């Protein structure tokens, strides 16, 4: 028996939820998923609490909710669809529950006021452009796991700061079309944190983002400067290690 109950845009409008500034968890209790585009372009929404009955947030579910500042995501959500919170300019922080396993492409793209992201250890897939254009991110918190990955940084690339000085990882940028081993073989897609302009110390490389040839002047692998990989050479990081504290 299928007990799925989707909160669709039609239901949102029928219940008058599209007219509210604050939506509490009891208003959504009993639904199992927030459907595609359910609250998209709801310009007056400032706060929403997603109850534990919800297991998934659909594509474009909250796209361009430009006044949204506060999100509480219940402890049953396992997936966030593509563009789910795209261009929610006013969000300042995100804490994802330990049940989340995947974040879709462009999910938090354009959240300009976002300064902190908490990514739990349950995450197995962060899709391309998931946090693109988040120019004010200062802290990324990764769950309590140590990851060993392979990455390739191309020679003609634009360097963006990513994470902070304590992180041993260098280059949160992955070669397109490949799957990288991380614990139980999760997949991290190309440019997961592309265009995070103001992050600290660790570079996120992107090939030709503005059509200009920006040379890599210094690359650090496992926290040690690699003199051999200056200039136009291809940079291959043998190991990326992500610690278990604020990075």
Language model features with spans:
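N-terminal capping/linker segments that flank leucine-rich repeat
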Residues: 1-37, 50, 136-179, 184-192, ...
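Structural signature of tandem-repeat unit edges
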Residues: 1-6, 14-33, 43-56, 66-79, ...
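Consensus positions within tandem repeat domains that build extended binding/scaffold surfaces
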Residues: 11, 35-40, 58-63, 81-86, ...
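Intrinsically disordered, low-complexity, compositionally biased regions/tails
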Residues: 20, 39-41, 62-64, 78, ...
């Amino acid at each position: 028996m299928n007990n799925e109950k989707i909160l669709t845009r039609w239901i949102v409008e029928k219940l008058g939820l599209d007219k509210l500034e604050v939506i509490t968890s009891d208003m959504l209790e009993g639904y199992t998923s927030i459907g595609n585009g359910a609250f998209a372009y709801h310009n007056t929404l400032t706060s929403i609490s997603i109850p534990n009955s919800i297991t998934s947030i659909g594509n474009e579910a909250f796209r361009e909710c430009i006044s949204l500042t506060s999100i509480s995501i219940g402890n049953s959500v396992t997936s966030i669809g593509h563009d789910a919170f795209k261009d929610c300019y006013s969000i300042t922080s995100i804490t994802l529950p330990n049940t989340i396993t995947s974040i879709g492409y462009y999910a938090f793209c354009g959240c300009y006021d976002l300064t902190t992201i908490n990514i739990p250890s349950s995450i197995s897939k962060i899709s391309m452009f998931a946090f693109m254009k988040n120019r004010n991110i200062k802290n990324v918190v990764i769950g309590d796991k140590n990851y060993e990955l392979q990455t390739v940084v191309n020679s003609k690339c634009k360097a963006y700061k990513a994470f902070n000085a304590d992180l041993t990882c260098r280059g949160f940028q992955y070669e397109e079309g490949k799957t990288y081993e991380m614990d139980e073989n999760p997949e991290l897609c190309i440019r997961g944190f592309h265009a995070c302009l103001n992050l600290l110390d660790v570079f996120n490389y992107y090939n030709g983002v503005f059509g200009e040839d920006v040379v890599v002047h210094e690359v650090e692998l496992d926290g040690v400067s690699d003199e051999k990989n200056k200039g136009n050479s291809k940079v291959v990081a043998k190991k990326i290690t992500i610690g278990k504290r604020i990075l």
